[in-house]
Amino acid sequence: MYPWLDRSGQLSWLKLSVFVGVTLPGLWAAVIWANGTPAAAGALGTSAMPVTAALHQIGLWAVRLLLITLAVTPLRRIGAWPRAITLRRMLGVSAFFYAAIHLALYVVQQNFRLGFVASEIVLRFYLSIGFVALVGLLVLAITSTDSAVRRLGGRKWQRLHYLVYPLTVLGLAHFFLQSKINVGEPILMSGFFIWLMLYRAAYHWNGDRGLSVVQLGLLAVGTAGLTLAGEALWYELATGIGGQRILAATFDFRHVRPAWWVMLVAAAFIPLKWAADRYWSRHRQAGGRAAAAA
């Protein structure tokens, strides 16, 4: 079945829109590669500059798509939008394909020296964990079909797909270690991941009641604080720049720190929650009036 069709085989404009959206970053990376200057790209367009730019863009989007996949659950619950669940499979499989293309571009960058690539994966820790994450995502992609759910059974399938959480951690660790000094983007992605995990923990703690607007606000602020602390700790331990300098720059908005972006995105779920509650409250009231009139 094509990814833009619903279960009845009909065109779904929502799924088609998401499919187009997940392909655009790949097309943009192809443009980056194709538009490398002859001097930089060489006769086949395979020298360091354009390939490396495409490699980094594709890897970044692999991580982003993993996080967007994990964001489907809070979007569905907070926004009271059950149809969002139909997008999760497409997003997750797209994350795998981006990760696989990321590896393929690394092979191209190394001039197709497969033996060298294999030795680098074994010897370099950040490449090793990235490869483990890719293999894990391959397993999840293969077992993402309806037939795989039937063969494994719902409970076993669900336990298997819980691996997405440690695999995302491995992907983020790979991102951190290859970024070295400039870890702004990995910090940002890690902050989003922290929020996604804390949201799940808080939701299960609350049970079927979900999270209130106040709880979502506290979660946004708390996640931003953890993101800032994590950034300061990274710079303190890994770079020698000093975490205090990061903390001191928190309110220097000439360069907005990742923690602020994390809080802004997390806080966006607050009006979504308010709007969803308001909509369903009106819907229930209208249903009650209709039942009373009948």
Task: Identify the residue ranges that each predicted region occupies.
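Membrane-embedded alpha-helical bundles that constitute the cytochrome b-like, heme-associated redox core
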Residues: M1-A294
